[in-house]
A protein has these predicted regions:
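RNA pseudouridine synthases
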Residues: 1-119
Length: 119
């Protein structure tokens, strides 16, 4: 188990001439933040291995998951437009600790089919 975020590497699940699919660990920014202490991020790490890699979307710092990066400006535009047009299906899963409520049929868990926040 990593002892510090600097020990957490991006895992590349797919790379070709058009795009990268990276597994971003929780605790790592997708893009640089404000301040010198917030420059370590997935996009900077990806650019070290794949110069010119371009951000398509972001994941919250506390979220681990798949991050798409484009290898060309044309691919970045196309993928960004697909996200904007909601053509990309996203799924989120949570790992919880403690007791989970009964199934939806019994008044417990189910699917949420709403945006996380208003656009």
């Amino acid at each position: 188990m990593p002892t510090a975020l600097t020990d957490c590497a991006l895992t590349c699940l797919h790379a070709d001439e058009a795009l990268l699919v990276l597994l971003k660990p929780a605790g790592l920014l997708s893009v640089p933040g404000r301040g010198a202490d917030k420059q370590d991020c997935a996009s900077a790490r990806a650019s070290q291995q794949w110069p010119g890699a371009l951000v398509v979307h972001r994941l919250d710092m506390a979220t681990s998951g798949l991050l798409l990066m484009a290898r060309t400006p044309a691919v970045q535009r196309a993928l960004s437009q697909a996200f904007a047009d909601r053509q990309v299906e996203k799924r989120y899963q949570a790992i919880v600790q403690g007791c989970v409520a009964a199934p939806e049929s019994q008044g417990g868990w189910g699917d949420i089919e709403l945006p996380i926040a208003a656009d």
